[in-house]
UniProtKB/Swiss-Prot annotation:
Organism: Mus musculus (Mouse)
Entries under InterPro entries matching the protein: G-protein_beta_WD-40_rep, PEX7, WD40/YVTN_repeat-like_dom_sf, WD40_repeat_CS, WD40_repeat_dom_sf, WD40_rpt
Pfam families: WD40
Alphabetical list of SMART domains matching this protein: WD40 (SM00320)
Function of the molecule: Receptor required for the peroxisomal import of proteins containing a C-terminal PTS2-type peroxisomal targeting signal. Specifically binds to cargo proteins containing a PTS2 peroxisomal targeting signal in the cytosol. Cargo protein-binding triggers interaction with PEX5 and formation of a ternary complex composed of PEX5 and PEX7 along with PTS2-containing cargo proteins, which is tranlocated into peroxisomes by passing through the PEX13-PEX14 docking complex.
Location (main, coarse): cytoplasm
Entry GO CC: cytosol; peroxisomal matrix
UniProt gene name: Pex7
Localization annotation: Cytoplasm, Cytosol; Peroxisome matrix
UniProt protein name: Peroxisomal targeting signal 2 receptor
Known partners and oligomeric status: Interacts with PEX5; interaction only takes place when PEX7 is associated with cargo proteins. Interacts with VWA8.
WD repeats: 60-91, 104-136, 148-179, 191-222, 235-266, 279-310
GO biological-process terms attached to the record: endochondral ossification; ether lipid biosynthetic process; fatty acid beta-oxidation; neuron migration; protein import into peroxisome matrix; protein targeting to peroxisome
Family: Belongs to the WD repeat peroxin-7 family.
Length: 318
């Protein structure tokens, strides 16, 4: 693996990282004081250069920030979510506070995602209040609220293929597929026998979703037949905090865990574990694969560091 570019952020514990879909080398990180248990949060916008990582903008919020998503129609705009139940809309072109705050959830908001299809510009949020909300960022209140989960919601992700369709993962051990047009659940999958902390859609197959759970396993689900997973990936030794499909390889994905590692997988291979990266000393919570560079990965951890690097398995063909 090439040497990681590292930025240490004293007193801030990383929860989420996401590359800009527009600007190569720009990365956003959502972080919290005191491991997110108390204190404030910070949105960090970073740029890469020859000397490493530099902070372009830093925005503070009065509660921990748990997730971040870039706008799909404005390179300067991001949305974060926080422990006080609110979402924040930020403009990196301005060094001021949020342009807008959306406050409807009654508990921590752990997940936020901007729609991937060009048909609409919507944001989905998932909360510990057991609800999912869909927002038009230009409107101050949510468009609709989705109920059905029986525990906290950890992950909400739009389909990159089907407009208005999103997945959610919950402490109730289910993966659920929803449609904004019906405001009801389409599919309920009892995907694990433990809490599910993350899910993601395959970029190359509209029917394939992956889940990562407290049972240390990753499972792939074909939405046309959900009786059993189409793959299971084992190797992590503690809960899987986040999972991301590759934008460049149909069967490659990455996962990060409370075992301090990031692992890379190819579920189509007999020996699917491609590489294990061990460069953090605390829970690794944030993870993203660059949309601009096929080899570049970013992660962040409770060890107060943000890293960008090129794992060997993505730089070697096959």
């Amino acid at each position: 693996m090439s040497a990681a570019r590292t930025l240490r952020v004293p007193g801030r514990h990383g929860y989420a990282a996401e590359f800009s879909p527009y600007l190569p080398g720009r990365l956003a990180c959502a972080a919290a004081q005191h491991y997110g248990i108390a204190g404030c949060g910070t949105l960090l916008v970073l740029d890469q250069n020859e000397s490493g990582l530099q902070i372009f903008r830093s925005f503070d919020w009065n509660d921990g920030l748990f997730d971040v998503t870039w706008s799909e129609n404005n390179e300067h705009v991001l949305v974060t979510c926080s422990g006080d139940g609110s979402l924040q809309l930020w403009d990196t072109a301005k060094a001021t506070g949020p342009l807008q705050v959306y406050k409807e959830h009654t508990q921590e908001v752990y997940s936020v995602d901007w729609s991937q299809t060009r048909g609409e510009q919507l944001v989905v949020s998932g909360s510990w209040d057991q609800t999912v909300k869909v927002w038009d960022p230009t409107v101050g209140n949510s468009l609709c609220t989705f109920r059905g989960h029986e525990s906290v919601i950890y992950s909400t992700i739009w389909s990159p293929h089907i407009p208005g369709c999103f997945a959610s993962a919950s402490g109730d051990q289910t993966l659920r597929i929803w449609d904004v047009k019906t405001t009801g659940v389409r599919i309920v999958i009892p995907a694990h026998q433990t809490e599910i902390l993350s899910c993601d859609w395959c970029k190359y197959n509209e029917n394939l979703v992956v889940t990562g759970a407290v049972d240390c396993s990753l499972r792939g689900w074909d939405l046309r037949n959900v009786r059993q997973p189409v793959f299971e990936l084992l190797g992590h030794t503690y809960a899987i905090r986040r999972v991301k499909f590759s934008p460049f390889h149909a069967s490659v994905l990455a996962s990060c865990s409370y075992d301090f590692t990031v692992r890379f997988w190819n579920f189509s291979k007999p020996d699917p574990l491609l590489e294990t990266v061990e460069h953090h000393t605390e829970f690794t919570c944030g993870l993203d694969l660059s949309l601009q560079s096929p080899t570049q990965v970013a992660d962040c951890s409770w060890d107060e560091t943000i890293k960008i690097y090129d794992p060997v398995c993505l730089t070697v063909p096959g």
